[in-house]
């Protein structure tokens, strides 16, 4: 399964790991399908580290899962933050996943075992490059808005 994140800076296509982390994948895909993420901003951007979004309030303090509460981590030894473009659930501690997610800009091995990886970027790395270069202000908030306009879900990861 794959999705395309249609941002105001361009499109990013991600493979979603439905078999490896079924609960996280179900949550993300259902939120995408419902339009939950449409029009949300990426509220935190740290060059060389990651970009974070998925909070409908745009503050980094909001968002919930499809179950209306936090859900447990799905940490897998086979999934590592070992490359640019890893897609993970953001959390405020163990088993506190909701709707927020982040995409890594580089390897981040110190995150392994702490955040559920549920996908990876497969196309649109040039858009990640643009995002990473966006200037930020207090709280690592982008000075120029980076918006997730909408999400397209693809049943076949190789589909256009």
UniProtKB/Swiss-Prot annotation:
Keywords: Chaperone, Cytoplasm, Isomerase, Rotamase. Pfam families: Pro_isomerase. The keyword Protein biosynthesis does not apply. It is found in: Cytoplasm. Residues 3-153 form the PPIase cyclophilin-type domain. Its EC number is 5.2.1.8. It catalyses: [protein]-peptidylproline (omega=180) = [protein]-peptidylproline (omega=0). The keyword Nuclease does not apply. GO terms for biological process: protein folding. Ubiquitous. GO terms for cellular component: cytoplasm. GO terms for molecular function: peptidyl-prolyl cis-trans isomerase activity. Gene3D superfamilies: Cyclophilin-like (2.40.100.10). PANTHER family: PEPTIDYL-PROLYL CIS-TRANS ISOMERASE-LIKE 3, PEPTIDYL-PROLYL CIS-TRANS ISOMERASE-RELATED. PPIases accelerate the folding of proteins. It catalyzes the cis-trans isomerization of proline imidic peptide bonds in oligopeptides. Belongs to the cyclophilin-type PPIase family. This is Peptidyl-prolyl cis-trans isomerase CYP18-1. The gene is CYP18-1.
